[in-house]
From Swiss-Prot:
Residues 998-1082 form the PB1 domain. Residues 781-806 have a biased composition (Polar residues). Expressed in roots, culms, leaves and young panicles. The gene is ARF21. Its main location: nucleus. The lineage of its organism: Eukaryota, Viridiplantae, Streptophyta, Embryophyta, Tracheophyta. This is Auxin response factor 21.
Amino acid sequence: MASSGGGGGGGEEGEGRGATKVNQELWYACAGPLVSLPPQGSLIVYFPQGHSEQVAASMRKDADAQIPSYPNLPSKLICILHSVTMLADPDTDEVYARMTLQPVSNVTQCDKETLLASELALKQTRPQTEFFCKTLTASDTSTHGGFSVPRRAAERIFPRLDFSMQPPAQELQARDLHDNVWTFRHIYRGQPKRHLLTTGWSLFVSGKRLLAGDSVLFIRDAKQQLLLGIRRANRQPTNLSSSVLSSDSMHIGILAAAAHAAANNSQFTIYYNPRASTSEFVIPFAKYQKAVYGNQLSLGMRFRMMFETEESGTRRYMGTITGISDLDPVRWKTSHWRNIQVAWDEAAPTERRTRVSLWEIEPIIAPFFIYPSPLFTAKRPRLPGMTDDETEMDGLLKRAMPWVGEEICKKDLNIQNSVVPGLNLAQWMNMQHSSSLPGTVVQPELLNSLSGKPVQNLAAADLSRQISFHPQFLQQNNIQFNTALVPQQNQQTEQLAKVIPTPNQLGSVIIPQKVVQDCNSEQRQHVVTQPVQGSQPNINIPQPQLVVQAQLQQPQVILQAQLQQPQVVVQAQLQQTQPSVQSHTVLQGGLQQIQLLQQQQPHVQHQQIPQQLHHQQQQTQQLQPVQQVQQSVQEHQQIKIQPVHVSMDASMNTQVADHQMKLQLLKALQPQQPLISEQQKMLLDLQQQVINSQSAPQQCVQVTNQAISLHNSNTIQYPTQQKVQSHQVQDLTGNVIPNSKSDIATSMGASSLHVAGGRQLLKTDDVPSTSTSPSTNSNPVLLQSIPSSSKNQSLTTAGKTSQSSVVLGPTIEQDTKPYQNVKQTVMIPKTTEQRPATGQDCINNNPQMDYLDTSSSATSVCLSQADGSLQQNFPPSSFHQHHLLKDTVPDSEFEVTDPRNNLLFGVNIDGQLGLPLNADLLANDIGTDKYMDQLPGNGISNFISSKDSQQELSSSMISHSFGVADMAFNSIDSAINDTPFLNRNSRSAAGPAHQRMRTYTKVHKRGAVGRSIDINRYSGYDELKHDVARMFGIEGQLGDQNRVGWKLVYEDHEKDVLLVGDDPWEDFVKCVRCIRILSPQEEMQMRLVGDFGDSFLPNQACSSSDGGHPWRITGD
């Protein structure tokens, strides 16, 4: 029962109420198991709004609206608790507490003892007292039945009976709250026998005026004294004590006292009735701070809340936060008192409030689901046509918190200890009242009010960059093209896609590639197609080489053409709003460039390569390449080219029809073509017959200058009556062989090989692909490796893809310094129908640059050349190509002394084309009976490969998510001796056999040195876990993955973190990249935010690699 708070401290007798101090243990037992008073001398937070609710609950009526408001009274007061006294009402035995408070203007000015007491208040625990509580029944309150005590309670609380007596009985004495002694006779009798309190019980019931529904409790204190208390059921009182003021007077009294004390920093007294109050309104300061500023709230968040049950028990009920708003926005604005709206999971016998205060609940900050986290479940294949824009955790967060945008469900990468995303209570209330409209939904610009450490790094204008699981989560994959596009590119990509129906620009086609149609082999066109989606192509044309580069850059598409002297600079900028003009402009620009080339051609081939070209390639390296096509033609003499910038004005209007412009361009190109040897023509015929296009027609234009390269096999050709001359470089798919020493690099999707300038890294990045499902294109891409006099060779393998791209990488110089930074890479195609086909020359003189690089489109494996040799057990073959260039390069340094000296994945790249191929040439059978009748002459026998041949690749190179479901993966123990391949010009003999190499997988544990293990040594998960636990000294703690503790997870090729043991062992061996042992804290962080940021495997290599140096011999 509450009383008004006067301005003074008052006496201990409760200001005329006759209350007495009571036993502390009995007071807490009567108050309830959830009640806890802050210690004297500590800081507390006082809520006048809650105090007013207690008055209304005591009077069984709501607060009168006529009560005056006190605008100068804040919704909460931080005070020092000078004194606290536990009291009990002499009439009703209801317990309450009297507290003397004094407001504090500045918490930092409090002495250390006060702050320490506040901290201790949060940690203090009250010792559990043995007690027994029972709700009285009608028979218990009758005058003749006595009080029945449950057997276990009687044996635990009451003294032992003397069972030698018949019936067993004893006399009990118990003291009440007011230190009155009550005597009862305890007897064990009845049928069945039970413990009863008989004599003296009726006196106690009548004296306390107990009714059915009230509760009686017995406890034993620290002195083993038996204490007796009562709890009255909440019922409408028939009369009120004369000492109790009217409801309005009490409301005015407590508010006036609090306002006066806040204005003058004076002491005031309040009374707290735990049985009448709906919630505690005097909260320890540390508890308040932790609840309001330490918890991140979000709508839909789950929570627990403790409730008192019958007979003084407790139980947690689960609920969901449905809203955060002021309980009384008029009188108590921005108040934290019961400002959380909740919905409960289940019904309860007692009525539960729909509004609670934050310090009353326990937010569930770890996972939003009851069942095991999907982060650690086995991977399942995505259904066809389903977008992978969001991860499972993204979906869970969005469903749980639909009130915020996608950005807030992320984690700040710079903050390693970020907690569950959301806003704390103070931020919620500030946002609501800073908005012009009440109840306004959270706006993105307000999210920068996140508390704690993240607030220093968040920018409201760039939340998508600041708050994230991982950068790859922020990328939205375009469904049609399966390419990662930033949101700003989506609109531009749609506009660029409208340019397609017209013939395309010089050296560049902005086409959303789909599929290809069969092209008539008799209609050979000069075709260069390059899919560019929302990107910026830079077309560099040093004469006589043509370099077409595709760069991803916003906000506009710029076409730059570099030609020879005179240095004319004209920039052609393709405007998105003029799609119909772009094609005309580029075609016309192509004609003008060709005419300029014809005028300046004669003496260009003998000029020097300037530093400008080298510098320009260094700048190109800084951009994100989508596709680059490079081609050069070299005569026997050293070719060094002087580039000149020639550009076109994209805004030029042209009246020339697309078809006519194309024909003129083709005619202009014809005089520029050099003679091609018979071997090259044979190879050309062979390639264009092997490649069988099967997709929708697209219009393309080819710009060639002595040598042209294709970057896309999906083309349609315009009819022409021109007879193809022997000196023209052409192919149905655009696969064109240069007439002299050149490196051909074929890569999957849109990989790029930067050769000009020698400064580009060959790596695979996220690139456009025209299919989101395994390709049905049945075009096998045949790769021919042409030897080059350069000492540095490039090696790539490719297969049939939805977009096959051929990069003609020129060897610009013969005897100048070798290229230093071009990556040696093996590209693995993203299809289920064709496996890596052949090898090619790779340029790499810098073993420190080797590393493993994976992407969503292809997997590239870089082979280290640090030891000067590689070994791989691909069978040898007699695929000779050395004589291809014998006529065109009479002074070539190549001399075949041993077929194995020029092996590349078991392929003799210096052999003659006409000799039969070994059946094990290709990793995939691309030349079966399907193409037998299409190959001319003896070329039929050159491309027969067995379907049974599947080369042994690394078990960690490809996962099934790349669509290569039928490829066999074993160890990478290999035996290819490529010392002559790496040193071809030295004419040295083959090096000695090297030690066989094996795979290994790194295992990491925070705070311990990483270990490496051979996955193939183990037969199953149990053996693996036992060995890993032994290595790191955690034996027996990796067994049960469903309980909290150490977890063994691994990362696959898509960089997904999965639980070890969920997938079949064979699948695990194929796709594991690295293994990590998670501590319980790391597991919790993983469950909360789905990512470790930069702390999870930072810059770590994976299976079959060590910091970018694959296939290195290691041991445990």
